[in-house]
A protein has these predicted regions:
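Minor-groove-contacting beta-hairpin "wing" of winged helix-turn-helix DNA-binding domains
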Residues: 58-67
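Non-catalytic recognition/regulatory regions in large multidomain proteins
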Residues: 2-3, 38-41, 56
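Short amphipathic alpha-helical interaction segments
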Residues: 33-48
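Short amphipathic alpha-helical interface segments
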Residues: 2-30, 83
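Short, amphipathic alpha-helical interaction segments positioned at domain boundaries
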Residues: 66-83
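A short, conserved structural fragment
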Residues: 47-58
């Protein structure tokens, strides 16, 4: 597998949030693809830039009222299907 850029990692996290809203599930599914540190860093960045919001202690949602999901690059489609 090729090395993913930080932008690719954040896009992957956003699309994974569409599939798994619970933070615990999100970390579990992404841990096969990304290091936990990268998942946490990407999630913190997405929350800080208001592209993702936390709903209660466990639920994470894309903040589509604030910003649209970026287009999914071809190189991430297969990775996303596998998580």
């Amino acid at each position: 597998m090729t090395e993913l850029s930080m932008n690719d990692k954040m896009i992957l996290i956003q699309y994974a949030i569409e599939k798994y809203e619970k933070e615990e599930d999100l970390f579990q599914k992404l841990s096969n693809t990304l290091p936990e540190k990268d998942i946490q860093r990407g999630l913190d960045t997405l929350i800080g830039t208001q592209r993702v919001r936390r709903i209660g202690p466990e639920i994470i949602q894309n903040n589509t009222s604030h910003t649209e999901l970026p287009e999914l690059p071809e190189n991430l489609k297969q990775i996303l299907e596998n998580i």
